[in-house]
């Protein structure tokens, strides 16, 4: 149930208002219906097609077909790229409104990918959109936004509490006009997917800089 905090002294009530906006309500209802009527039935097809498969890093015949059916249906309904706040490339939702959408996506293991809102692609697309060069956006962001490829994200390192990005020790050093990366990563999200075409790697370029840089 939506939560509305009581007024406290002179505090602004808006900062406690966690209700979905009225503008997002139609989209939320559409997503909810899609998950129940399209995503879940296709997920059942996906599971059935994968019975007997032993390799976790491959897809059995029929699995990707079920997934692509869902993606095609989502595209046709305009249920695509909700996570990007920029309305030109995404839906222009606030984080609060997207939280409600994400809660519905979580009711089916494939719903997020069917609507192109699955990690690690979501964060990788945000990085490319905000700091990517025009060439990088054309080569990598565009096919990611279109759901044609998948991506990976490499931050975790052996022996280091890597959930805090300040701790990463992998180095990137400029050698002429090329960056040379030295280090070790593991538990790389998305790397095992055969559709993965790009990996974003967290590295240090200036080890003597302040920790937050």
Identify the meaning behind each predicted range:
Residues 170-173:
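A structural signal for short hydrophobic beta-strand segments in well-ordered beta-sheet cores
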Residues 2-119, 130, 135-139, 143, ...:
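Amphipathic, small/basic residue-rich leader segments at the start of a protein or domain
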Residues 178, 182-213:
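A short core secondary-structure module
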Residues 160-168:
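Active-site-adjacent elements of ketosynthase-type condensing enzymes
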Residues 87, 156-160, 187-189:
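Short, solvent-exposed loop/turn elements at beta->coil junctions and helix N-caps
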Residues 105, 131-133, 175-177, 204-208:
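Short loop segments at secondary-structure junctions
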Residues 147-156:
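A short, Trp-centered hydrophobic/proline-enriched beta-strand micro-motif
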Residues 125-131, 153-154:
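Flexible, glycine-rich active-site loops centered on histidine and acidic residues
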